[in-house]
C-alpha cells in the first residue's frame, strides 16, 4: 500500500473502478494514476483469455496442401511424392479436428502416417518441419527403447509425456500435437507366425501402442518412469494427436518384389525388368500386406492408413542439401566464419566429395555434418586466434584429407584489429 500521496487517505482511489483505498487490499500508484488489486486481477484475466484465443487452433490458420508443400520445399530437398502425400494427410487431419470427427453422421477417422525410407533420407526432418509449419507441439520417440508395461524399458505413455513437456504442460495444446516414432521397423515381430514366448520389445510394444494410436484417454505419469498407485496422472486424450511412424524397413523391397513377381508371372511380364528397379521405386509399390509380412501386426498396420515412401538420396540431392535449404550446413558454417570476419568458400568438387563420402558411409543426409566437422575441426580451432585471415577455401583435396584449407591473409585486417 502506498502512502504519502496526500494527507486524506479517503481521497486516494482507483483510477479505473473508482474504489477508495480502504475498500481494496492494495492500491498501486503511478504518475498521477492509481490501480487497485481487483482491477489488476481483472486485467490479467482479460489478457489470459486473449492469449488462449490466439493459441486456439483454427482451420483458417492451417495452410492448404500446396502451401504446406511450398514451405517443406524450403527445408527438405527432393522427396517430392512424400511431401505431396504428407501435405494432404496433415491438412486432412487438422481439418477433421476443427470440423469435428463427425459431420452429417459420417465419421471421419484419424489418418496416422507411416514413413518408409533409408537412413538419412529426411523422415525426421519432414515430421519436424510439419510441426513447425503448423505451430503445434512436437515430440520424437525411439521405438527401440519401448517395452510393454511390466518390463524393463520405457512405457508407451512416456512418449505422451514428451509431447506434454513440449507443450509446456498445456494439455489442450498437447492434444493437437504431432508425435514422431522413429525406428518403428525395429519392433516388428521376429517371425510372421505368432510366437509362444513373449516378445516384449516387438509385438508387445505394437499391442501397447494400438490404443494411443487410435485414440484413448491415457494416464500419463508427470515425472515419467513407471506407474505406481500413489502417483497422480495427467489425463491426455490422444484422439486428435497425429502419429507419424518412421523406419528404414531394410529388406522389405524383397518382399514387395516377391509379391509383384508372383502377381505378374501369369501374364508373361518382364519380371527381370521390375527387379532391376531402384529400391525407392520398388517401395512406391508397397501395400499393407508387405508390412504384415515384414512383422507388423494387422491391427497396428490398420491404424497407420497413410503410407509414405522416401527415396535414397543420390549425390546431386546431397549436394543440394548442403547448399539450398534455409538452414543448409554450408550456410551455417559460413555464418560461423563470418562472425570471425572470415569468408568461407567450398568448391563444387569439395561439395561433391562430401556427398560421395556420405554415400560411402551409408548415412545419407544425417552424415553430412559429421563429415564437415571432421574436416573443419583444425581450421575452426585456429582461425579465432588469428587476426590476419580474411578468407578460407575448402577444396576436394581438403575433404579427402590430402591438403589443408587454403587461407588468404591480409595485413590490413591485422593492423585494423590491433589498433582496435
UniProtKB/Swiss-Prot annotation:
Any one of the GO BP annotations: cell division
Under SMART domains, the record lists: AAA (SM00382), ClpB_D2-small (SM01086), zf-C4_ClpX (SM00994)
Where Zn(2+) binds, per the record, is at 14, 17, 36, 39
Annotated positions binding ATP: 118-125
Pfam families attached to this UniProt entry:
AAA_2, ClpB_D2-small, zf-C4_ClpX
Domain ClpX-type ZB: residue ranges:
2-55
Q: Which InterPro entries does the UniProt entry name for this protein?
A: AAA+_ATPase (IPR003593), ATP-dep_Clp_protease_ClpX (IPR050052), ATPase_AAA_core (IPR003959), Clp_ATPase_C (IPR019489), Clp_protease_ATP-bd_su_ClpX (IPR004487), ClpX_bact (IPR046425), P-loop_NTPase (IPR027417), Znf_CppX_C4 (IPR010603)
MF GO annotations? ATP binding; ATP hydrolysis activity; ATP-dependent protein folding chaperone; protein dimerization activity; unfolded protein binding; zinc ion binding
Keywords noted in UniProt = ATP-binding, Chaperone, Metal-binding, Nucleotide-binding, Zinc
- Extract the CDD domains matched here: RecA-like_ClpX
A single GO cellular-component term from the record reads: HslUV protease complex
The record's comment on protein family reads: Belongs to the ClpX chaperone family.
Q: What does this protein do?
A: ATP-dependent specificity component of the Clp protease. It directs the protease to specific substrates. Can perform chaperone functions in the absence of ClpP.
UniProt-listed HAMAP family: ClpX
How it assembles, according to the record, is: Component of the ClpX-ClpP complex. Forms a hexameric ring that, in the presence of ATP, binds to fourteen ClpP subunits assembled into a disk-like structure with a central cavity, resembling the structure of eukaryotic proteasomes.
Q: What is this protein called?
A: ATP-dependent Clp protease ATP-binding subunit ClpX
Can you name the source organism? Heliobacterium modesticaldum (strain ATCC 51547 / Ice1)
